[in-house]
Amino acid sequence: MIIRFKINEIECEVNEEKEDITILQACTANGIEIPRFCYHEKLTIAGNCRMCLVYVTNEEKLLAACGIPLDENFDDESIETEIDEILKAREGVMEFLLINHPLDCPICDQGGECDLQEQTLAYGLDTGRFYIKKRAVEIKTFGRLIKGIMTRCIHCTRCVRFLTEIAGVNELGVLGRGYNMEIGTYKKNVMIESELSGNIIDLCPVGALTSAVYAYKGRPWELKNIKGIDIFDTLLTPINYQVKGGEIFRILPRINDRINEEWITDKVRFHYESYKIIEKIRKETPSYKIQANKFIELTWKTALKMVFKVLLNKKNKVDLIIGSKINSTNLRIYKELMNRLGSKNYITENGLMFKKFNYDLRENYINSNDLYNVDKNDLVLLCGINLRVESPLLNIKLRNVNFGDDEIESVKKIGIIGNKFDWKHESEYIGATLNSMLKLFEGRLPYCQQIKKSKAPLIIVGPSLLTRISLTLQEMRAIFMKACNLKPENILIITQGANFGMALEEGLFKEKFSIGGNVLYSIDSNEVQVTNKINYVIYQGIINDKFENKIDLYLPSKHYFEDFEGDREVYMNTFGQRSEIEKLSISKGNKIKENSMIGYIQLMYLNNKEMTRKEKEQKDIKLSYREMKKEEKRKIKVNKYLTINNIIENYYMTDINIRLSKNLMITGQLRKEKKIMEAGIWKNRKCI
Amino acid sequence: MFRSLLKRTTFLNQLNKSNGFNRNYFKQSTLTRSDALSRHVETEDNNEHTPFDFTQENLVKVEKILAKYPKQYRQSALIPLLDLAQRQNGGWISLRAMDKVAHICGIAPMTAYEVASFYTMFNRTKIGENFVQVCTTTPCMLRGSGEIIKTCKSHLGIQVGETTPDNKFTLVEVECLGACVNAPMMCINDDFYEDLTSASTINLLDQIKNNKPTKIGPQTHRKAAEGPQGKTTLLEPPVGPTCRDDL
Ligand code: SF4
Ligand code: FES
Ligand code: FES
């Protein structure tokens, strides 16, 4: 049935069968703004703030627009949002909200982006009438990252809904009632144990939940937005750096419905602390080690000469390892450099995990799935991946998978091979060893039948499985497709590192690579094991904490977001989606050079010619799987009883930037020890 | 100069007082009610390590309660189970007891905390053996509940919200308990005592203190809620059904 109605004299119609929308959504679609506090697009409807009241003809009372679906009752009715009655009602609601709200806007971090402030200005009464006692609630601690000044809370319950529905942790709740109602953890000093807890800071419409790291640092109107990406995750979530005067003040998500919706992980939200520390402790000039712990400073000219002395020495065997944040321009330059030197020993640090890889076809390293409709799947099998830690954003997408009505029955729609971890739905735990994986390949498990039966299964293969089995990705895919009757879209392969896909795009991979040479040239790569065989280490990057004392020649280079020629650079995620990043400069030292600049100089030195930039043709190549099937016949040789453990032990330790962010580190440690936070942690933070 | 400043502040104070408000006065949530604080208070007898488990006979009751609800909605048993736990625990419900109930219902502990803190009849801090709840809502107040509360305070030697040192009594004020016809009234544990006077209150408290039997219901000669002329309506016996038999 088509419903025709009017909103403020605008004629609208809604097809009831096709669209299922509320009054508020219809108003927004027609460009009419309705003030709100508790309603949020991505959360369930609570309807407890009453700010969204509208007038509907033939209704006795005003209706809360956020919670009322448009159905046949609205046919021929008209909805009014600007009449006096509504304005009066809004004033009333605002007045009630402000009774107990403290007047500390000048010292509140939300000031300037506070919904309550803005809406008071737009819809509130111009004078207050309450001179009675104000209620106060004690300050609560939710960990090192989130500051909870709960007197400011207006009880919209967005934070509670986010944590229970989306993040899947039940650590916040609505306690007490009436005058005594509080949002809190009930027990004292409970840390919110979610990788996505930082999002409640963005969700909170007032300053009750604010970032502890950003506390008293800046005001939103002085900050400039610069586009960036979440470099710690293969999804490459779009983010915004908020900067002022060459310093990152905070990081906020950029909305993208295909990737992150509105959320970002805590890791990227709070890691910017480290840049400041890095700025303080890094070396700003090229330097050379003469003794243990004793460096002399060099000029760039001599430093580069020394590099060439090493690289061009015929006796040396050079391995080039590139870090996971380097962009594709640099990947191309350094590959070219190594090629000119006649060597093929180059790889990215994440590529090191894989023994074999066929990067001829794009299908082999890029997933053809679309995250947008990931929740349409009706069965999920996780192989060797702890989604919560390895890809928290994908995890929350999958947590909302609609399992239909049989969710209640005992059919378990989630299978896990590898380490156990908590999920919303009950899951079937298949096994931790490779043996169960092999059984699955051969179709011997009862679970295979379930996979075959389901309409849209999704199999997620994690890096820990890929590294323990001597199969290439495409072989794995082919086996799966054969064993369980699947299509390529049903398999999702999660790798690690931001530039893994891009490196393969540039052909920067070598099969069976092992660090065997005596010279290691590391470009911003920390996660490499430096053996005793290596007698010369060139480290070109920012800061190193893994093999710092083994570095012989240090070349300071810039961060990944400072290091490209134009204003923008494009990164590609594991789904082949591209995210743009903009240039941001925070490095102060003028002797710090871009990786690309160093690379070009080296190339020019090599043959005094401009490098011709070869771009690999970026067409979508669709090829049949015939070739792969040939390879499939090879036997799989593995130790059957190897367990598929997680690659990432501690979520808060995976990258140098994270290891250097104090608050993230402490959060990680606290969580590791499962320790309840000590009281008084705020006192040493000089926050309040 | 200091003196003039002092004068000025006292003047301001007086002004505030005479206007009947004080602008800068912030207040913590009230402590005196049975709903107490909206959070857990760590004490010796109620902390993370205080053990709680249902007794054998109560476990049978738990099964019975769970059987009333469809299997997939077993969280509906939350309130009856919390009540059972509270009874077993001596009138109050500890942190671990809530965790236990939540576990039985298959929900997060937080949900149990939310429910227990919402309903004022769940006590989340330790109370005395006898929980004296004096009604102070309008009908009772008009019939003299102020006097009753005063008597309780002076006789037990405690304030509202406190427990006697011998752990016998806890005194609280409550809202209407639905016995307004026989106001003023109070409720001690599960029993109602109505038509109170100061004397009968003292008498009652003494009897309870010495573990003597008490008269439940009106403390005067009134029978149930009859008026002064006795029963005038509903003279014939009630027709059934009277109550659900599964309750
Ligand atoms: S803390 Fe913020 S998000 Fe949570 S209920 Fe209060 S106002 Fe809403
Ligand atoms: S937005 Fe509708 S009630 Fe809060
Ligand atoms: S007012 Fe006291 S019982 Fe109703």
Curated annotation (Swiss-Prot), chain A:
Its EC number is 7.1.1.2. [4Fe-4S] cluster 2 binds at C153, C156, C159, C204. CDD domains: fer2, MopB_Res-Cmplx1_Nad11-M. It catalyses: a ubiquinone + NADH + 5 H(+)(in) = a ubiquinol + NAD(+) + 4 H(+)(out). [2Fe-2S] cluster binds at C38, C49, C52, C66. It is found in: Mitochondrion inner membrane. Pfam families: Fer2_4, Fer4_NDSU1, Fer4_Nqo3, Molybdopterin, NADH-G_4Fe-4S_3. InterPro entries: 2Fe-2S_ferredoxin-like_sf, 2Fe-2S_ferredoxin-type, Mopterin_OxRdtase, Mopterin_OxRdtase_4Fe-4S_dom, NADH_UbQ_OxRdtase_75kDa_su_CS, NADH_UbQ_OxRdtase_ferredoxin, NADH_UbQ_OxRdtase_Gsu, NADH_UbQ_OxRdtase_Gsu_4Fe4S-bd. GO terms for cellular component: mitochondrial inner membrane. It comes from the Eukaryota. Keywords: 2Fe-2S, 4Fe-4S, Electron transport, Iron, Iron-sulfur, Membrane, Metal-binding, Mitochondrion, Mitochondrion inner membrane, NAD, Oxidoreductase, Respiratory chain, Translocase, Transport, Ubiquinone. GO terms for molecular function: 2 iron, 2 sulfur cluster binding; 4 iron, 4 sulfur cluster binding; metal ion binding; NADH dehydrogenase (ubiquinone) activity. Its cofactor is [2Fe-2S] cluster; [4Fe-4S] cluster. Residues 85-124 form the 4Fe-4S His(Cys)3-ligated-type domain. The keyword Iron-sulfur applies. Belongs to the complex I 75 kDa subunit family. This is NADH-ubiquinone oxidoreductase 75 kDa subunit. It comes from Dictyostelium discoideum (Social amoeba).
From Swiss-Prot, chain B:
GO terms for molecular function: 2 iron, 2 sulfur cluster binding; metal ion binding; NADH dehydrogenase (ubiquinone) activity. Residues 1-40 form a transit peptide. Its EC number is 7.1.1.2. This is NADH dehydrogenase [ubiquinone] flavoprotein 2, mitochondrial. [2Fe-2S] cluster binds at C135, C140, C176, C180. Keywords: 2Fe-2S, Electron transport, Iron, Iron-sulfur, Membrane, Metal-binding, Mitochondrion, Mitochondrion inner membrane, NAD, Oxidoreductase, Respiratory chain, Transit peptide, Translocase, Transport, Ubiquinone. It is found in: Mitochondrion inner membrane. CDD domains: TRX_Fd_NuoE. InterPro entries: NuoE-like, NuoE_dom, NuoE_N, Thioredoxin-like_sf. Its main location: mitochondrion. Core subunit of the mitochondrial membrane respiratory chain NADH dehydrogenase (Complex I) that is believed to belong to the minimal assembly required for catalysis. Complex I functions in the transfer of electrons from NADH to the respiratory chain. The immediate electron acceptor for the enzyme is believed to be ubiquinone. One of its GO terms (biological process) is mitochondrial electron transport, NADH to ubiquinone. It comes from Dictyostelium discoideum (Social amoeba). GO terms for cellular component: mitochondrial inner membrane; respiratory chain complex I. It comes from the Eukaryota. Residues 211-247 are annotated as: Disordered. Complex I is composed of 45 different subunits. This is a component of the flavoprotein-sulfur (FP) fragment of the enzyme.
